[in-house]
């Protein structure tokens, strides 16, 4: 006989084959046979294996054939076989007395027949039983594993843990794994069935609207069938162990019903009491009472029965009434030996149940702060004693100390669960506010249903106040901003009058009533008579008037206190408690009243109920307010549609004008000078402007290309002209000039080669509509005044409005010039129009300019990409919008005055409405700075734009050249302003610029410059001539800047005269002007006497007449030195 362990431990060079003869195998005992039959394994074959032969009945041959070629693999195979042997994985023979080959982890194959050896064979069941029950006697027919086998298994696990794990997962028999699992579980400490550690997770996982109690498992765990075993186990413990075991039993219990039941059962075990009751403290600080959580619970009473009985027959005991009430009030224990002899004992319960109460032990349950949270009461001893002794009292007191902690924890847990459910309900209500915003009845019904279910009340009502919800007044209340400077008169009146006034104002118009669980909500509109005869309506009226929350425990008493009359006795008889709360909107205005009537258990509403109900009232107010706002918004939208229809009708040109324009003969483009960059509209009448627009459309071949009906085009042009306001600059003629410049750029400037026909159509439409309904004010003014346009459009305010007006005209009947376009072309052209109109905002120009300059600097010549085309169109729109700066000087000068007048009008509005100082270009008092500001505008915006366009597209050079010419004119005008020679002396900018007459052709020597020419000789008539120096007068009358320096032109002329006189040559200009300047300056430095003429030297003062007299005449040399310093 070859032993498996010996083969595993032997050192052989080749894989051995061990054959066990039938005579060398000991016969299996019946127990071993049964064990082997119970541990059959399914073998797996990886390759061809040696066939296993079996002998009849009681003989089994074990053949081990190794496929590995190394000693280590052979050893591992045998070790794994040893593991199988130790864990009982021997397989029984098949019905054909054959065994299937089994693959080992190391690659070997083994044919194993069910064999057992007295030295190394053991079943898994025997091993587990021997380890789990060390003191039990083993079966004589089983063999215990030797220490060597255990060491071999441990060594294999240490050397090959991965192989061991693989064997367990892949080849271990299910029976062995099951026994191993049972063995592991038996080594763990027993799990306490009373502690529901996963209770909170089950609460959270359950539906908050359906699951209201802890899972039913808590009730079934304490069933009567398991009590006898528990009781026998506890009876075997001594008193200390029993006490600690019962404390552990309630320590971690979170279900308040289960906890109270365990407390009463455990107290009965500790004190041998027959039955017990547990009361929990409820109510407010001024109205405390006890509620029987569980009543008359014995050790055999099931939890489910106890809870059902307590819920159906709720017992309420006020503090100070009865034995339990007295204990709760005094916090003192009461031990009664004979209950019927105590006056505080109520024998009615005994009479109902037939039970006789002898001894009573009643003790308070306090929390860690010493406040009463409950009262426990036990009745009658069961061990033959007639009373509870001091030992029972001490045990009862000590146990209730721990129970107080458990009860408070359970109550906190219950509060957290209730808060969780409350939050879930409020989230659902928040969703409902948006889901049901168009149906007030459904929304209020859903809120009332949730409130009724959560707060356990019989009925719920909502009264809605008759509010002034008309659209106009409602919007006025929202938009109206109180003026801080406005002082409103005091409206102090008597409180009684104020109450009556509010009462009349807060009249209910809608009543929502929700009854029992299966009753539908009732919506009614009660009359004034019905409201006056309803006590509930009177209470609601009181709450709506005062804005206070009312929690009524006794309706009759409240009615008497507030001097109300009880009109309906049946209504009062069915009402015990009312919780009434106002519903307010976002403006803190009472819009309704919510009522809860009667708690389901008959107790008053608590502060906790009021707190929860407040959240419902808030959500109800939000829902009602949101629904009313939604209804008002829908009405306003309907009104807006009607207004748009009216506006569209009045914005459309009338039929007579359309027919007249349709029949008119449109002249050629050359007659209107449309191809020229010097086009001007001053000579065109209004009808000619419309004909010029038609000619541009026809010259671009847009009418035939896009099949635009001619009458529709005429009507659209007239409608566009009609929708421009008669402001000074941003009017219809400005739109015509912008469109003509775009036409000239496309035709004369050859820009049409970069555009498609659809884009040309969009650009011309955008130019004509880019300032529709302009009000003569810019975007900044709209933002400052917070106009409706600024509220509607946050960026590019006026430009968005212009585009919307364009769309409105196109959508008007008979004005859609895009009607023949396909949907794709329509979207494309509308996108072009929108982008082009928005590009006229200079803020957009500055955003796009850098990107456009970068493309130009990189030598871009292909402008067909979408982004590049958008940049190009934006630059072209800006170039057309400011093209007046490139017109001939006569036209540019006149247009600039129109722009300035419009800007000055806006500045006046800012001073009047906003009480702010406008910027310089809009300040009428600084109109003399306009030429300088024009130069800045050209340098910052116009010249960079036209320069880059001219460099890229040389055919539009006239725009750049015209801008340069106008810049020179404005610069010259700005210099002359410094001399006081321009329009600043006029109230309006409508006179030509003052010039030096004949400066171009005549010799300067023939022109006599005087102080009067420089506006320095005019005397002030408004100030005291004796005390006011000349240099303190109006700056517009001086010839020098405020800094004392002369203008550039004046310095040039004066220096030329000075140099000619110094080198002895004949001066071309008289030095009278020089002497006047110097004399005036000298006079300014000395006080003016009454005898001297005001304003210094006046008249014709030559150089030869400057003789000294009485120290007042300055020498000619000194004058020239002073003049040089001045220059």
Curated annotation (Swiss-Prot):
Ranges of residues in domain GAF: 255-407, 439-624
Membrane-topology annotation of the record: Lipid-anchor
Enzyme's top EC category: hydrolase
Cited Pfam families: GAF, PDEase_I
Residue ranges crossing the lipid bilayer per the database entry: none
SUPFAM superfamilies the record matches: GAF domain-like, HD-domain/PDEase-like
Superkingdom of source: Eukaryota
Biased composition (Low complexity): 1-19, 36-72, 116-133, 214-225, 1099-1114
InterPro entries noted in UniProt: GAF (IPR003018), GAF-like_dom_sf (IPR029016), HD/PDEase_dom (IPR003607), PDEase (IPR023088), PDEase_catalytic_dom (IPR002073), PDEase_catalytic_dom_sf (IPR036971), PDEase_CS (IPR023174)
Positions of the propeptide segment: 1125-1127
Record EC number: 3.1.4.35
Binding site for a divalent metal cation 1: 734, 770-771, 881
Modified residues (Cysteine methyl ester): 1124
A GO BP entry: cGMP metabolic process
Residues at the catalytic site: 730 (proton donor)
GO CC annotation, single: plasma membrane
Residue positions of covalent lipid attachment, annotated as S-farnesyl cysteine: 1124
UniProtKB keywords: Cell membrane, cGMP, Hydrolase, Lipoprotein, Membrane, Metal-binding, Methylation, Prenylation, Repeat
Cofactor mode of binding and number, as noted: Binds 2 divalent metal cations per subunit. Site 1 may preferentially bind zinc ions, while site 2 has a preference for magnesium and/or manganese ions.
Function in brief: Has a role regulating cGMP transport in Malpighian tubule principal cells.
Annotated protein name in UniProt: cGMP-specific 3',5'-cyclic phosphodiesterase
Organism, as annotated: Drosophila willistoni
């Amino acid at each position: 006989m070859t032993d498996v362990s010996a083969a595993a431990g032997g050192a052989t060079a080749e894989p051995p084959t061990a054959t066990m003869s039938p005579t060398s195998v000991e016969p299996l005992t019946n127990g071993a046979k049964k064990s082997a039959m119970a541990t059959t394994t399914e073998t797996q074959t990886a390759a061809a294996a040696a066939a296993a032969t079996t002998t009849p009945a009681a003989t089994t041959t074990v053949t081990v054939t190794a496929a590995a070629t190394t000693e280590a693999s052979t050893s591992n195979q045998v070790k794994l076989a040893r593991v199988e042997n130790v864990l009982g994985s021997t397989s029984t023979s098949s019905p054909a007395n054959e065994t299937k080959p089994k693959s080992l982890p190391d690659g070997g194959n083994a044919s194993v027949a069910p064999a057992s050896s007295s030295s190394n064979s053991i079943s898994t069941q025997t091993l587990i039983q021997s380890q789990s029950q060390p003191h039990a006697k083993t079966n004589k027919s089983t063999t215990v594993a030797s220490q060597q086998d255990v060491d071999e298994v441990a060594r294999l696990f240490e050397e090959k843990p991965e192989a061991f794990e693989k064997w367990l997962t892949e080849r271990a028999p299910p029976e062995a794994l099951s026994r191993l699992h049972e063995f592991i579980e038996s080594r763990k400490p027993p799990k306490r069935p009373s502690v529901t550690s996963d209770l909170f997770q089950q609460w959270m996982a359950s539906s908050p609207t359906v699951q209201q109690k802890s899972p039913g498992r808590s009730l079934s765990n304490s069933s009567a069938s398991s009590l006898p075993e528990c009781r026998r186990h506890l009876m075997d413990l001594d008193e200390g162990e029993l006490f600690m075991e019962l404390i552990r039993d309630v320590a971690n219990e979170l279900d308040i019903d289960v906890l109270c039941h365990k407390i009463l059962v455990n107290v009965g075990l500790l004190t041998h009491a027959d039955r017990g009751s547990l009361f929990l403290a409820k109510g407010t600080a001024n109205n405390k009472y006890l509620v029987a959580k569980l009543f008359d619970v014995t050790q055999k009473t099931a939890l489910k029965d106890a809870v059902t009985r307590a819920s159906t027959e709720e017992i309420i005991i006020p503090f100070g009434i009865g034995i339990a009430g007295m204990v709760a009030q005094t916090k003192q224990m009461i031990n009664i030996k004979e209950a019927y002899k105590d006056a505080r004992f109520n024998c009615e319960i005994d009479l109902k149940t037939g039970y006789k109460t002898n001894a009573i032990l009643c003790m308070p349950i306090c929390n860690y702060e010493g406040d009463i949270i409950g009262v426990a009461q036990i009745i009658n001893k069961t061990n033959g004693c007639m009373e509870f002794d001091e030992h029972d009292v001490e045990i009862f007191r000590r146990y209730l100390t721990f129970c107080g902690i458990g009860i408070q924890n359970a109550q906190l847990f219950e509060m957290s669960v209730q808060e969780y459910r409350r939050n879930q309900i409020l989230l659902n209500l928040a969703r409902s506010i948006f889901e049901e915003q168009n149906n007030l009845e459904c929304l209020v019904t859903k809120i009332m249903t949730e409130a009724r279910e959560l707060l356990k009340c019989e009925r719920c009502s909502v009264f809605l106040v008759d509010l002034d919800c008309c659209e106009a007044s409602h919007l006025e209340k929202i938009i109206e901003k109180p003026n801080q400077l406005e002082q409103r008169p005091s409206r102090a009146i008597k409180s009684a009058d104020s109450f009556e006034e509010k009462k009349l104002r807060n009249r209910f118009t809608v009543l929502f009533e929700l009854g029992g669980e299966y009753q539908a909500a009732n919506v009614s509109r009660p009359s004034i008579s019905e409201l006056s005869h309803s006590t509930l309506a009177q209470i609601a009226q009181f709450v709506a008037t005062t804005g206070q929350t009312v929690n009524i425990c006794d309706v009759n008493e409240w009615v008497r206190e507030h001097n109300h009359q009880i009109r309906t006795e049946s209504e009062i008889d069915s009402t015990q408690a009312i919780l009434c709360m106002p519903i307010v909107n976002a403006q803190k205005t009472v819009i309704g009243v919510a009522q809860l009537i009667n708690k389901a258990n008959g107790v008053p509403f608590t502060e906790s109920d009021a707190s929860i109900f407040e959240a419902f009232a808030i959500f109800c107010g939000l829902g009602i307010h949101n629904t009313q706002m939604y209804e008002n918004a829908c009405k306003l939208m309907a009104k807006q549609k009607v207004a748009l229809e009216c506006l569209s009708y009045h914005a459309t040109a009338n039929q007579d004008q359309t027919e007249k324009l349709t029949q008119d003969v449109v002249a050629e483009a050359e007659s209107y000078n449309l191809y020229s960059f010097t086009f001007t509209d001053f000579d065109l009448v209004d009808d000619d402007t419309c004909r010029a627009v038609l000619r541009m459309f026809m010259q671009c071949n847009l009418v035939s290309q896009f099949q635009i009906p001619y009458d529709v085009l005429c009507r659209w042009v007239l409608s566009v002209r009609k929708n421009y306001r008669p402001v000074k600059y941003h009017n219809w003629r400005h739109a015509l000039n912008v469109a003509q410049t775009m036409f000239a750029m496309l035709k004369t400037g050859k820009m049409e080669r970069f555009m498609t026909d659809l884009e040309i159509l969009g650009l011309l439409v955008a130019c004509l509509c880019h300032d529709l309904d302009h009000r003569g004010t810019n975007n900044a003014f709209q933002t400052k005044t917070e106009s409706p346009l600024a509220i509607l459009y946050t960026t590019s305010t006026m430009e968005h409005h212009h585009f919307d007006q364009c769309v409105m005209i196109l959508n008007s009947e008979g004005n859609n010039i895009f009607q023949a376009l396909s949907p794709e072309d329509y979207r494309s052209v509308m996108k072009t129009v929108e982008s082009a109109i928005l590009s006229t905002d200079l803020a957009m120009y500055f955003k796009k300019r850098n990107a456009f300059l970068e493309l130009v600097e990189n030598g871009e010549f292909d402008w067909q990409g979408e982004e590049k085309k958008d940049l190009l169109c934006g630059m072209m729109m800006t170039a057309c919008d400011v093209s007046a700066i490139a017109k001939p000087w006569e036209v540019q000068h006149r247009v600039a005055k129109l722009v300035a007048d419009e800007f000055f009008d806006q500045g006046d509005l800012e001073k009047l409405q906003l009480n702010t100082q406008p910027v310089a270009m809009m300040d009428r008092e600084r109109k003399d700075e306009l030429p300088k500001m024009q130069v800045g505008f050209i340098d910052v915006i116009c010249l960079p734009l036209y320069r880059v366009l001219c460099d890229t597209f040389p055919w539009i050079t006239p725009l750049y050249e015209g801008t340069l010419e106008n810049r020179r004119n404005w610069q010259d005008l700005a210099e002359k302003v410094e001399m006081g020679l321009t329009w600043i002396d006029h109230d309006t900018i409508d006179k030509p610029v003052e010039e030096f007459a004949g400066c171009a052709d005549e010799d300067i020597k023939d022109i006599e410059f005087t102080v009067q020419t420089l506006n320095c000789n005019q005397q002030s008539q408004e100030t005291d001539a004796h005390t006011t120096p000349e240099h303190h007068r109006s700056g517009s009358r001086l010839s020098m800047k405020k800094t004392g320096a002369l203008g550039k032109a004046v310095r040039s002329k004066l220096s030329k005269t000075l140099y000619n006189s110094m080198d002895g040559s004949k001066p071309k200009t008289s030095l009278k002007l020089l002497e006047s300047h110097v004399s005036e300056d000298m006079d300014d430095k000395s006080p003016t006497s009454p005898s001297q003429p005001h304003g210094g030297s006046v008249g014709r003062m030559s150089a030869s007449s400057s003789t000294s007299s009485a120290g007042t005449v300055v020498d000619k040399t000194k004058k020239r030195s002073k003049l040089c310093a001045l220059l």
